[in-house]
Swiss-Prot record:
This is Flagellar biosynthetic protein FliR. Keywords: Bacterial flagellum, Cell membrane, Membrane, Transmembrane, Transmembrane helix. It is found in: Cell membrane; Bacterial flagellum basal body. It comes from the Bacteria. Role in flagellar biosynthesis.
Amino acid sequence: MLTFNSWDMVNWVSQFFWPFVRILALISTAPVFNERAIGNRVKIGLGVLITLLVAPYLPLNTTPIFSVAGVWLLIQQILIGVTLGLSMQLAFAAIRHAGELIGLQMGLAFATFFDPTGGPNMQVVARFLNILAILLFLTFDGHLWMISLLADSFYTLPISANPIISHAFLALARAGGLIFINGLMLALPIITLLLTINLALGMLNRVAPQLSIFVVGFPITLTVGIMTLGLLLPLIPPFAEHLFSEVFDLLADILTQLSSS
């Protein structure tokens, strides 16, 4: 006859609770999963489903939930999940940054897209590129790679109360440069072209002062910007694929550094 006491119950809950915390922290911060259009019940349900698939294969952790070690372990799992989720946001932030730079040069900085779901307002070009990045992320199975990396993190960085103080978080802070480098690389062709047009319009204004540069300049820069953005669209998928791959390599490096601390 099987016996089931309170201690077995605590061990069983702990076996599923700690992975659930890390998984839910990632879902709350990772791109696509953290969209406000996805309800909290769906996010929690997805977290429970992934936990049920992952937790049975993990080593047993007997750390009491209501203890000092349990509080530290809770904070640790939240930090790991948030680190993984925010690291993946770097790729989308780079693409949004490129959209803001392009919109600024096109004269569309005033055109802000209102998000009815309560998310942050963005410029029109930045919003368009962000939606395109989400579609490409799903097309490249980025969400599946992210879940796979999360599952591997339980083996690379097991659930334990050991300290994780490391320079890995400093590496994450330095990785913020990816936003500016990749964003500028994506927007640089359009920025260069529009800057050349603005210089030409400035010289034209010096030659013919009676020409209203504000009336002529805005339609020209807007039209050329839209046409150039259309020509740039076929180059965005390989750029986004390289960017996502770079961020996933960064995540793997951060997990390795955390596990070696």
